[in-house]
Amino acid sequence: MRTTKVYKLVIHKKGFGGSDDELVVNPKVFPHIKLGDIVEIAHPNDEYSPLLLQVKSLKEDLQKETISVDQTVTQVFRLRPYQDVYVNVVDPKDVTLDLVELTFKDQYIGRGDMWRLKKSLVSTCAYITQKVEFAGIRAQAGELWVKNEKVMCGYISEETRVVFRSTSAMVYIFIQMSCEMWDFDIYGDLYFEKAVNGFLADLFTKWKEKNCSHEVTVVLFSRTFYDAKSIDEFPEINRASIQEDHKGRFYEDFYKVVVQNERREEWTSLLVTIKKLFIQYPVLVRLEQAGGFPQGDNSTSAQGNYLEAINLSFNVFDKHYINRNFDRTGQMSVVITPGVGVFEVDRLLMILTKQRMIDNGIGVDLVCMGEQPLHAVPLFKLHNRSVPRDSRLGDDYNIPHWINHSFYTSKSQLFCNSFTPRIKLAGKKSASEKTKNGRDTSLGTPKESENTLPIQVDYDAYDAQVFRLPGPSRAQRLATCRSVREQENHSRKSASSCDVSSSPSLPSRALPTEEVRSQASDDSSLGKSTNILMIPNPHLHQYEVSSSLGYTSTRDVLENMIEPPQRDSSAPGRFHVGSAESMLHVRPGGYTPQRALINPFAPSRMPMKLTSNRRRWMHTFPVGPSGEAIQIHHQTRQNMAELQGSRQRDPTHSSAELLELAYHEAAGRHSTSRQPGDSMSLNFSGTEELSVSLLSNSSTGVNPRTQNKDSLEDSVSTSPDPMPGFCCTVGVDWKSLTTPACLPLTTDYFPDRQGLQNDYTEGCYDLLPEADMDRRDEEGVQMTAQQVFEEFICQRLMQGYQIIVQPKTQKPNTTVPPPLSSSPLYSRGLVSRNRPEEEGQYWLSMGRTFHKVTLKDKMITVTRYLPKYPYESAQIHYTYSLCPSHSDSEFVSCWVDFCHERLEEYKWNYLDQYICSAGSEDFSLIESLKFWRTRFLLLPACVTATKRITEGEVHCDIYGDKPRADEDEWQLLDGFIRFVEGLNRIRRRHRSDRMIRKGTAMKGLQMTGPISAHSLEAAGPPVGKKGTSALSALLEMEASQKSLGEQQTTVHGKSSTQPAENSSVAMTPTYVDSPRKDGAFFMEFVRSPRTASSAFYPQASVDQTAPLVLDSTSLGVSTGQPMDRGNNQTFGNSQNIEQAFPSANSGDYSSQQHVASSLTSSSTLVEILEAMKHPSTGVQLLSEQKGLSPCCFISAEVVHWLMNNVEGVQTQAMGIDIMQKMLEEQLITHASGEAWRTFIYGFYFYKIVMDKEPERVAMQQPSAPWYTAGADDFASFQRKWFEVAFVAEELVHSEIPAFLLPWLPSRPASYASRHSSFSRSFGGRSQAAALLAATVPEQRTVTLDVDVNNRTDRLEWCSCYYHGNFSLNAAFEIKLHWMAVTATVLFEMVQGWHRKATSCGFLLVPVLEGPFALPSYLYGDPLRAQLFIPLNLSCLLKEGSEHLFDSFEPETYWDRMHLFQEAIAHRFGFVQDKYSVSAFNFPAENKPQYIHVTGTVFLQLPYSKRKFSGQQRRRRNSTSSTNQNMFCEERVGYNWAYNTMLTKTWRSSATGDEKFADRLLKDFTDFCINRDNRLVTFWTNCLEKMHASAP
């Protein structure tokens, strides 16, 4: 009951009363209101719509007679504070929304996450602009729809459809540069101007208004036909990209990439670039001035490479799970053509395109600049290269329902649109007249013969129609078909509504009425396809195949509408002009020559079959009054007020009838009456798209009310008269072009039982998720059966499946409720919403595969239905010429394969087992699961040098100026230890009382370096305030033993920004020979900051530094970093070393010295161990962590402790020796309890063996192989903890660049595994090295629990692969692979790592996997080609010499060249990127790869490592190499690629700005071609060094 009592409205701000509720109610004032009620608030006599809010909390202290509403909400609804309002409780059923649009930006939301977000919104209220948050996902409510009206607020029920629209999608814009671009349209605009100044300019403006941040790629494409008789007329080098078409003409397809994967605030500047390209274009694509080529002609748009272009983008979209970005969702291809949407295409390619597009849920928008024709578009004219032409067949056409098309009207056109009709319109006829003879004879209706001139229908409108989608859960498809005549008996005002039998030709359809101007689907939905209606066909019982042919042939599950005897299941059929009567016969796998006819001028008579493909995008759009999808960009110029009546339908109608009725109704025609004997075999192709819309709202289950039986018929008879179609125009679907919709989570197509039995094979398997709980390790989190069940649904959604929503009336299975609970809408109120339901069942579909997932008694049953006759999916090889974005005019020949993976082959059983195992080692991720993956690299931050370049430094080769000083290295190493601690989520104990008493404390576990500063990240926060690590304290202490003054010099010299000041550090070089130098694994660590390529063992004393000015192998990073001077004020004064030790307040400086002096290298191991255990002066032990035994320490810290506390231990190698002996004596052991024989220096956990575990020690005799004991424990330990070895590199005691050394440094034994000279780690040099290489794998794996902060209620885990070794001169790789993670939660974790890295002096950035992969590879991108930068060697060669390194051994030439190139890369700030060659990578090409310290750019040396003959060597070196092929092995230089993963989210001062990479490219290229003689200067400096050091 509604009350008229008024209350005062007060407003509150968010967070009022400790809650974020939008509505606060006093239960004393409103005794009848309870939690969960929906309350309607409105000012008396107010024209604005009332506000609906849900009561989530009651507050008794609110003043009398008031109700309090959140301020932001009152502003949206224009409610006035302190005014009177009515407050009424409303029934949720009356205010339930049909469709909610959520828009979001800069996030990746997987489909599984969307579904879980949708479920969290059920039983709540929504209002426009409302912010929605779930598990870190943020979205905002856009449009809300009830039936065909937009509303301001409403209630979300289980049946409400939620559509997600993304304002940061991946958008490919293809501009077809066919010959029409140079023509004028009828208004005098050049089509090119119309496209660029008109459409693109408008699009970019709309993006800006909507605040979009799409990642955009713009490509100009065209096809050039050559006047040639044979391939021999073309230059040999270009023949690869010349193709021959079905008519024997030679052609070449061109793609010029204008921008690639870019995000910009302002896109209009791009228009200028496109205009410049327009002027050069004829020359680029060999239409003019093409020497050596036959005469070329640009193709028309109809003969162009339209399908090929969109397939290139699909090759990228297919791989959306690779290089997964966390700040965009959605994929869209937009093709701008100067034509009218008619294309001549290859049949196989068309079918393949359709399969790929529909299955992958990609939106394709076709924007035509031409005049809208009077026939259906888009229209494909098919040519069959594969099947010999059959002389009986005419032309073959197809109207693709899956392409969303728009016609763009330029501003000048609008002025000319003042008059419309070209012929007189028919007057209205009475209903009785119309149905005489069972045929509508009004104007324009075709007669029986199909030769009558086609009626001119507006095809766009039809498109609209086609995409008229029905409401939410229309599964009435399951209904048994009742023929329409049964309805007629209910009550008919006029002649019967649809009879076909009386005349072969169904009335053609007129203007799709209101849909035309109706509201629209924007999005990349598959399209508003055009009017494809019915074709006259005498065989009434023949069920014909859909217009879009392709692979929805009648083999797709058929509707129940036709009784089985009449069903003719056929292979994909085709419509040919002239074969109207032909039946389709089944020949699985082959095509039949007889095909149905399609007449593009009267598509309304074309048969249309309902299939799951056609329904894939239906739930994206609101539904019109008669159930059709509403798409705003189809507008009609006629007033359709008559259609606005409210029509509801009888929920019992079968979908077929509804379709049919709606079809006619929408067409504004009445059909003839049906004879009683007729079976309902109506050719009813209601074009599903057309009208499936038609299914009524009521049947959707949203509002099951009593239906008015007459309403349907009435509306039919009063609908407007046929109206020639040209009065309707298709505009531009701006909504889909600005905020593309993601593929809907639900669909309503369900196959009938008969179809499932006849056409499908059924397979099922059961899983008992909770059965194996006992054998899992105790700590492993366990998923309940309900959680596993939901995860199964999520996984299917993630792979593109859709949940089939069925109407409430009929259940597919009598015992189990249909998806989303069959209970009456509101019986599960607010409270029960999250109650896990013991039983559940979901049906899901994708293409022609269906899954039924059932949970009963903790057992999950998965039933899969696969088609008995799968389609053969073609693989099409395509060759084209590509000009990448960084190149002005050079086209490269590329090839790719277009293919579509068969859905039937996905290993669901394996995936389901993987989910059940929740990350345990029984199942690991395999490539065929298409798991999501992102690769990250940890790079040493070089803020100073980067900043200098950003601020305008002319040259970029300022990174390798000075070698890193020791403290910097130590600092970095220490930072790395803190970073890995962060990965391991280890917190050091007693942080609060371990503050160092000096300027600022170091943060975290400082492992190295006089605590000079946060040396490498000036931009980062001041180095920590939280205490420090044992190592740093020890290093400090060591520093303090030297004179304070000297220390100050060093540190301050280092920290100054002027590199010149570093000279204060340079003292005379001292080379110390190490006892283990002979070839033991850890080579000597000379006390020289940078003589080794990556030796980063902290040196014992700073005063022996020998800076090496340039060492080619040390791809180090710039020193000269500004440091925070506050950090280094007083090194010498008594810093409390204690904080490094567990008991933080005992011990002082003198006792420390005492310990140090009492231990010598001759002390017994037990003595040293006792000193290590000392609570205040010993090694800092890790506090007890879950899963770590007590008394653990980190191996690198103990080695540094030994160096500082034991006399005579001066190098890491000696410290490692002592620890190695302890390990052998079993005084210490690896923390997993594993009896390793090797002590590994790095971030490895070891524990002190306590007396209380002698049995354990006895078990692990040294004689036992190191890998046997406790293998399971060990494996699970390794899956939980990150452990990284620190690589010791070979030292070169010399200032001479490596490439000029008389003998080259030894290289890793297996080149492929190491990829570069940088890591000279374990070469095959000694037994110790071999053992270590066995113990320390290249790559290790950890299973991470992602959701540390419990943001979600599911188990979230991912596999993390990381490098087993860390070297300061190489990037450290971390790869994440996942299936069961909420992307936002994972992103939150990685962002935490990113911040941690910054505070540790590093930079963590997402990078491309396989940046140099060829277009045809798994990681390749068909529109990306690497840029080659040649190295000008000719300027360095001496007169008469053939090779740069002629004075050395010939077999070292290549290695020297390689080292020389590395030295140049090092100067520019590149470090090595040892990408892991794992099972997931493309064929392991062992080409050395580098990444810039800013993470913005990759370099690759374009040749693999191998020995060459002298002749080859000479050729290689000549810059004018014979073969200039892109990927050839012949040129000396570098391949260059941008890291497109580095978006704004990840940028900081350490990555430089967006222009940084281009500046670097320009300067690097200048250096390599020897501009301003820079290359020669560099070379001569190197030679001088060599001569200077010669005796």
Swiss-Prot record:
| InterPro entries reported for this sequence | DEP_dom, DEPDC5_CTD, IML1, IML1_double_psi_beta_barrel, IML1_N, WH-like_DNA-bd_sf, WH_DNA-bd_sf
Spans through the membrane: none
GO CC terms of this entry: Cul3-RING ubiquitin ligase complex; cytosol; GATOR1 complex; lysosomal membrane; perinuclear region of cytoplasm
Q: How is it modified after translation?
A: Phosphorylation at Ser-992 and Ser-1518 by AKT1 and PIM1 inhibit the activity of DEPDC5, releasing inhibition of the mTORC1 pathway.
Q: Where is the composition biased (Low complexity)?
A: 494-508
Polar residues compositional bias: what residue ranges?
518-532, 1118-1149
Q: Which residues fall in a compositionally biased region of kind Basic and acidic residues? A: 430-439
Where is this chain's protein located in or outside the cell? Lysosome membrane; Cytoplasm, Cytosol; Cytoplasm, Perinuclear region
Q: Which SMART domains match?
A: DEP (SM00049)
Q: What is its main location?
A: membrane
Which Gene Ontology BP annotations are present?
cellular response to amino acid starvation; intracellular signal transduction; negative regulation of TORC1 signaling
**Function noted in UniProt:** As a component of the GATOR1 complex functions as an inhibitor of the amino acid-sensing branch of the mTORC1 pathway. In response to amino acid depletion, the GATOR1 complex has GTPase activating protein (GAP) activity and strongly increases GTP hydrolysis by RagA/RRAGA (or RagB/RRAGB) within heterodimeric Rag complexes, thereby turning them into their inactive GDP-bound form, releasing mTORC1 from lysosomal surface and inhibiting mTORC1 signaling.
What is written about domains in the entry's comments?
The DEP domain mediates the interaction with KLHL22.
Q: State whether it acts alone or in a complex, and with which partners, per the record.
A: Within the GATOR complex, component of the GATOR1 subcomplex, made of DEPDC5, NPRL2 and NPRL3. GATOR1 mediates the strong interaction of the GATOR complex with small GTPases Rag (RagA/RRAGA, RagB/RRAGB, RagC/RRAGC and/or RagD/RRAGD) heterodimers. GATOR1 interacts with GPR155/LYCHOS; interaction takes place in presence of cholesterol and prevents interaction between GATOR1 and KICSTOR. Interacts with SAMTOR; interaction is direct and takes place in presence of methionine, leading to inhibit the activity of the GATOR1 complex.
Protein name, please? Answer: GATOR1 complex protein DEPDC5
Q: Which source organism?
A: Mus musculus (Mouse)
